[in-house]
Swiss-Prot record:
Gene this protein is translated from: rpoC
A Pfam match: RNA_pol_Rpb1_4
Protein name listed in UniProt: DNA-directed RNA polymerase subunit beta'
Reactions mediated catalytically: RNA(n) + a ribonucleoside 5'-triphosphate = RNA(n+1) + diphosphate
Source domain of life: Bacteria
UniProt entry tagged with the keyword Metal-binding: yes
Gene Ontology cellular-component annotations: DNA-directed RNA polymerase complex
Lineage: Bacteria, Bacillati, Actinomycetota, Actinomycetes, Frankiales
Cofactor, how bound (note): Binds 1 Mg(2+) ion per subunit.
Residues binding Zn(2+) 1: 60, 62, 75, 78
Cofactor: Mg(2+); Zn(2+)
Its job: DNA-dependent RNA polymerase catalyzes the transcription of DNA into RNA using the four ribonucleoside triphosphates as substrates.
């Protein structure tokens, strides 16, 4: 087997017949599979043991050799090698074909590679391959030229002979006619009889002349065809071809089928063809030049690689190992087999029949038909259904060919190589575990015992509870009491991974320390539910066990839930108190007027606690408490003589004192009622300023307090708590009358239907809002429903409005708003009509959700694919460039306030240049991480814009550098080298995809003028599609003139430089952004709507199109209230603009019109310029994510994404080499991924001993001059040296 760690590249190429024979362990000659009586493989058949290896370990076919001691012997009786049965997974066979066949991928793919190489149309190629036309493969032009006069003379002689013969025959007939007529006259026959005889004779003579003329014409045609015959001419007329072959067979060769192509390819001069194509490209224009370019790509692919074009025609077919196309016996004694066996059997049957026909010397027509059938059988084996009707099995199901084995979700790539099943894992239903700490999970005992079985068994043997592993295993299976104690010991501090499908982002898998629990359900900490998107209505989760010490260390350090509090998408905490916890804290921090014990003073919190326990003071009563060792609230005004650290008295409640005990020491006292937003702000602040351990502890304390006081608060919802506003009827009456007035105006013809609708919609929207206000005012503050909404625990006012106010307006299936509202609420109940019209919205919601989930998943998959090789490869690329971002804007009072988008643009980035205030003083130097503190300093200094480093301007050749990426949002520190930031970016954009809406909004119910929004808009942007009804942008700067016609506006721009005016026709329905006489700059948008990104790239250049795309994507996410950092979107856009289109190739090896990566283009140009050559020129290209994924340098990654056969065909012809830099390629071949601790700078760390360590080793005599040899993980002999005495030097940061 290949050892994946011993190669750095993987090349794919075209296999020649010799390669196939070299791989093979023998020829498969018979179509038989297994003997149905003995169930043993047939000799020379598709499962033959002699070819593929034994079916049982160390046992030959006939049974002469059994047992491992005969290893490697080949049995002289049956010829089977004695070895392991697993060789049947890797040994191949082959079928020697009686006639060559073409490989369907190269003939039938789009574009047809064979067609491009030979310059034949695919239709003509098909005629040759499937025996419908002859092809001339060779013409001896010199001999033809030499002998042409002789041949022409010979043909002339033949024609003359025919003429002479014709004349003689006609003369003979003429004489016979005269004799006949004389005889008739002598007999005195009538004129009628004489005329008949004459006509008959003339007819015969005419036929004679025609027959000879046809022969002469045929001779001319044959000779003309021969004179003008060229290599690769097709001749569909079989008779003509035979005539040519009989007469001039010495001067040319021709044939049908793959044989003809094979002969043609053998004589094909690649170098000469390439030269003539380059000449055509230099001198040609238009269509001709374009075709020559495409052909040159294929020709130069064969020229530049070791591939031979002969590889596209096969003399033998490989047979894949039998264990990859198994045959298994079912219960009923029948057999189930892989479709491939059927396809192979068809090939073998037809091949054997063809061999027999050739041996018998059968007529050409029969042989050709058999060859055609063999070609079709091989086509079906390689790619069934690519040409003609697919071969079907029982029940008309198309058989799965070799190509189908690779393609799609069930194919080899995605099913078996990128997604494998995992040992040491289990799954179960989840339930909540409120008693757990943030880093813990509850693991059912049975499950833990099964998962940790090997560990428990080893420990039992170590502790002498069992003699050997076998008895230990028996003890575990019988669950002896001692086993549970050992299990408890084994799982201590051994983290497990929990995963909930769908794993939309990296927080879908986190590590926890297991706690054994009774029952069969896994227990989950309530605060990690947000990250997993889990609830307890029957969700299941999978458990995985990290085995090695390194895996455990990584799980504990990188994946432990208490280390993953921040969201990788926005850098803000995800582990927020929610639902009951919010209610509890809200209740705890509430201040109730007139409660028991109001106005009392206490000397300390402890005294207040005693009073509370004695029921003398209520939890929410306003009291005065003297606080010591406490930081006062930020809004507290201290007395004149107060200094920090003094005791102070505060008017607060006992509940708030309890709440503050949950917060870290030294945190400012919180003296306010905390709803969800305020609680989130506190957690946010903690995450920004405190170590993770403390944040986790505080979150746990808040969780416990929340649950405890939510229970004590007694918040429950009864139907009586849903209180409708008492004046609802009056409000409705008022608006009802207004609606009637509008209806009357419409009936009288004062309003159009459109106006009536919009007026009614406006009236009822107003009514709904009025009722919502009345309802809100009507709720008492302690009403449980109101408390739930007010605290932010659950629901919002819109939902409460539907319960207690009125449902309001709904839309119909067309997407228009129905102008009659639903006046009832759910508390009163709806009428039948109201219920009916509201069903549409409800159903659409569910249908939309289902569609969105699939679309969003597909978007995530494409994003991951395009960005999977973006890894932080170096500390700093050293670029000076950056992008300008707005960090502050002027508020209403003219004071600078933080820009609302600074959170997703400037936050967590590295400054590219110093932030300098008006006096020229450096406030924050370049290279600083822009956290909340730095941003506040910059704003206080009156600076509005800063230049920050960005992935868009990073100059790393591969991936990005740590400085340009900035802070890792998930950890809050500068990103580590080796972090797979591309995958994180893709997950951050894809994960909220399900929340985005699907619908296309109608502007005010007008059909047509739709704006694409939500998920489809994000897809449109990332796929770089031209939007429907795109808004034009100006190509020059100048003044605007607007001309109106009946149907359109014409916006004319008069350029400043006096060149020709440019007119932009615009639909009358669009909203103009410019007015007559305005002066506009290049790239200004003329009307509202979506702009074509390709236009932006063409007119304004790459930087502007990057910023435009970031901005547009953010617009969609912001409209749904989703916070994603710009840097994630930038990484995807960097990948979309990675390539350039070569315009002129200069002296480089690049081809004009070729797409190539910018890095390769620049390197090639540098090479040429250094040798004094002419560099190439190119223009940047914006590629959609699907195209960019398929255009990647890695053929493994592209093939596992989409269009597998096309990618592999292309890669094989170009002998593409995959340098295994991305993640997917390495997962596919089973190597460690080059990210995180798998990156070479962490893998190749050598631990050098210090001087003290060397000295300590003298005593053991293990020291040899020339250094110390260490095996893996320092397994040198000698005494153990304390770890902290080792000096790791600068060989890499050892985390």
């Amino acid at each position: 087997m290949l050892d994946v760690n011993f190669f750095d590249e993987l090349r794919i190429g075209l296999a020649t017949a010799d390669d196939i024979r070299q791989w093979s362990h023998g020829e498969v000659k018979k179509p038989e599979t297994i003997n149905y009586r003995t169930l043993k493989p047939e000799k020379d058949g598709l499962f033959c043991e002699k070819i593929f290896g034994p079916t049982r370990d160390w046992e030959c076919y006939c049974g002469k050799y059994k047992r491992v001691r005969f290893k490697g012997i080949i049995c002289e009786r049956c010829g089977v090698e004695v070895t392991r049965a697993k060789v049947r997974r890797e040994r191949m066979g082959h079928i020697e074909l009686a006639a060559p066949v073409t490989h369907i991928w190269y003939f039938k793919g789009v574009p047809s590679r064979l067609g491009y190489l030979l310059d034949l149309a695919p239709k003509d190629l098909e005629k040759v391959i499937y025996f419908a036309a002859y092809m001339i493969t060779k013409v001896d032009t010199d001999a033809r030229h030499r002998d042409l006069p002789t041949l022409e003379a010979r043909i002339g002689v033949e024609k003359q002979q025919l003429e002479d013969k014709k004349n003689a025959d006609v003369e003979v007939r003429q004489k016979r006619l005269e004799a006949d007529l004389a005889q008739l006259e002598a007999e005195g026959a009538k004129g009628d009889a004489r005329r008949k005889v004459r006509e008959s004779a003339e007819r015969e003579m005419r036929q004679l002349r025609d027959r000879v003329q046809r022969k002469i014409d045929d001779l001319d045609r044959v000779f003309d065809r021969f004179k003008n015959m060229k290599v690769q001419d097709l001749e569909p007329d079989e008779l003509l071809y035979r005539e040519l072959r009989d007469r001039f067979g010495a001067y040319f060769d021709g044939g049908m089928g793959a044989e003809a192509l094979q002969r043609r390819l053998a004589d094909f001069d690649l170098a000469a063809e390439a030269e003539s194509l380059r000449e055509t490209i230099r001198s040609g224009k238009g269509q001709k030049k374009a075709r020559a370019l495409k052909r040159l790509k294929v020709v130069s692919a064969f020229l530049n690689t070791r591939n031979s074009p002969m590889g596209m025609v096969l003399d033998c077919v490989p047979v894949i190992p039998p264990d990859l196309r198994p045959m298994v016996q079912l219960d009923g004694g029948r057999f189930a087999t892989s479709d491939l066996n059927d396809l192979y059997r068809r090939v073998i049957n037809r091949n054997n029949r063809l061999k027999r026909l050739l041996d018998l010397g059968a007529p050409e027509i029969i042989v050709n038909n058999e060859k055609r059938m063999l070609q079709e059988a091989v086509d079906a084996l390689f790619d069934n259904g690519r040409r003609g009707r697919p071969v079907t099995g029982p029940g008309n199901r198309p058989l799965k060919s070799l190509s189908d084995m690779l393609k799609g979700k069930q194919g080899r790539f995605r099913q078996n190589l990128l997604g494998k099943r995992v040992d040491y894992s289990g799954r179960s239903v989840i339930v909540v575990g409120p008693q757990l700490k943030l880093h813990q999970c509850g693991l059912p005992k049975q499950m833990a015992l099964e998962l940790f079985k090997p560990f428990v068994m080893k420990r039992l043997v170590d502790l002498n509870h069992a003699q050997n592993i076998k008895s230990a295993k028996r003890m575990v299976e019988r669950a002896r009491p001692v086993v549970w104690d050992v299990l408890e010991e084994v799982i201590t501090e051994h983290p497990v991974l929990l995963n909930r499908a769908p794993t939309l982002h990296r927080l879908g898998i986190q590590a926890f320390e297991p706690q054994l629990v009774e029952g069969k359900a896994i227990q989950i900490h309530p605060l990690v539910c947000t990250a997993f998107n889990a609830d307890f209505d029957g969700d299941q989760m999978a458990v995985h066990l990290p085995l090695s010490a390194e895996a455990q260390a990584e799980a504990r350090i990188l994946m432990l839930s208490s280390n993953n509090i921040l969201s990788p998408a926005s850098g803000r905490p995800l582990a927020m108190p929610s639902l009951d916890m919010v209610t509890g804290v809200f209740h705890l921090s509430r201040l109730a007027e007139g409660a028991l014990g109001e106005g009392r003073s206490f000397s300390s919190v402890a005294e207040a606690q005693m009073a509370f326990d004695a029921r003398e003071v209520a939890l929410q009563a306003k009291i005065r408490v003297r606080l010591r060792d406490t930081t006062p609230p930020s809004d507290w005004v201290p007395p004149a003589d107060w200094v920090t650290g003094d005791v102070f008295t505060l008017e607060t409640t006992f509940g708030r004192c309890l709440l503050n005990e949950a917060l870290p020491e030294g945190y400012p006292f919180i003296n306010a009622q905390l709803n969800k937003k305020a609680q989130a702000a506190i957690v946010n602040d903690l995450a920004e300023r405190y170590p993770k351990i403390q944040v986790a502890a505080t979150l746990d304390a808040l969780k416990s307090a929340g649950f405890y006081w939510a229970t004590r608060s007694g918040v429950t919802v009864a139907i009586e708590d849903v209180v409708a506003p008492p004046n609802k009827a009056e409000i409705l009456d008022d608006y009802e009358q207004r609606a009637d007035r509008v209806q009357k105006q419409f009936d009288r013809g004062f309003l159009s239907d459109e106006e009536r609708r919009s007026e009614l919609v406006q009236i009822w929207t107003e009514a709904t809002n009025k009722i919502a206000e009345a309802m809100e005012e009507n709720f008492p503050e302690t009403n449980p429903v109101y408390v739930l909404v007010n605290s932010g625990a659950a629901g919002n006012m819109m939902q409460i409005r539907q319960l207690a106010g009125m449902r309001g307006l709904v839309s119909n299936p067309k997407g228009e708003i129905i102008p009659r509202p639903i006046k009832a609420n759910f508390r009163e109940g709806l009428t039948v009509l109201e219920y009916f019209i509201s069903t549409h919205g409800a159903r659409k919601g569910l249908a939309d959700t289902a569609l969105r989930t699939a679309d969003s998943g597909y978007l995530t998959r494409r994003l991951v694919d395009v960005s999977q090789d973006v890894i932080v490869r170096e500390e700093d690329c050293g670029t000076e460039r950056g992008i300008l971002t707005r960090i502050a804007r002027k508020g209403a009072d003219g004071v600078l306030v933080r820009d609302r988008y600074a959170e997703t643009s400037a936050y967590a980035r590295t400054l590219a240049s110093d932030a300098i205030d008006a006096n020229g003083e450096v406030i924050v130097p370049a290279g600083t991480d822009a956290g909340d503190v730095a941003i506040s300093q910059i704003i206080e200094a009156g600076i509005e814009q800063v230049r920050v480093r960005s992935a868009l301007t990073c100059e790393s050749r591969m991936g990005v550098c740590a400085q340009c990426y900035g802070r890792s949002l998930a950890t809050g520190k500068l990103v580590d080298v080796g972090e797979a930031v591309g995958i994180v970016a893709a997950q951050s954009i894809g994960e909220p995809g399900t929340q985005l809406t699907m619908r296309t909004f109608h502007s005010g119910g007008v059909a047509g003028d739709d704006i694409t929004q939500g998920l489809p808009r994000v897809v449109e942007l990332f796929e770089a599609r031209s939007p429907k009804g795109k808004a034009p942008i100006t190509e020059v700067s100048g003044r605007v003139k607007i001309e109106e016609t009946e149907k359109t506006f014409k916006v004319v721009v008069v350029p400043d430089d006096g060149s020709d005016e440019i007119a932009y026709p615009v639909s009358r329905r669009s909203r103009l952004r410019v007015r007559e006489g305005d002066h506009i700059e290049v790239g200004s948008q003329i009307v509202d709507g979506a702009v074509d990104p390709h236009e932006v790239l063409r007119i304004l250049g790459p930087r502007q199109v990057q910023l435009h795309l970031v901005d547009q994507v953010q617009e969609v996410y912001r409209s749904q209230g989703v916070s994603i950092h710009d840097k994630h979107i930038e990484i995807i856009i960097r990948q979309m603009l990675k390539r350039v289109n070569v315009l002129e190739s200069g002296d480089t090896t690049l081809l004009p019109g070729e797409l190539c990566e910018r890095a390769r283009f620049e390197a090639e140009n540098r090479r040429v310029v250094e040798t004094g050559g002419q560099p190439a020129s190119a223009r940047p290209v914006l590629m959609g994510i699907t195209k960019a994924s398929l255009a990647t340098e890695s053929w493994l990654s592209a093939a596992s994404f989409q269009e597998t056969t096309r990618v592999l065909t292309d890669a094989a012809i170009n002998a593409r080499s995959d340098s295994l830099v991305g993640l997917k390629e390495n997962v596919i071949i089973g190597k460690l991924i080059p990210a995180g601790t798998g990156i070479s700078r962490y893998r190749n760390i050598r631990v050098e001993p210090t001087e003290e360590a060397r000295a300590a080793m003298y005593s053991v005599g293990a020291y040899e001059d020339g250094g110390v040899e260490y095996g893996a993980f320092g397994t040198g002999s000698g005494q153990a040296v304390p770890l902290d005495e080792f000096d790791y030097r600068s060989s890499g940061d050892f985390r």
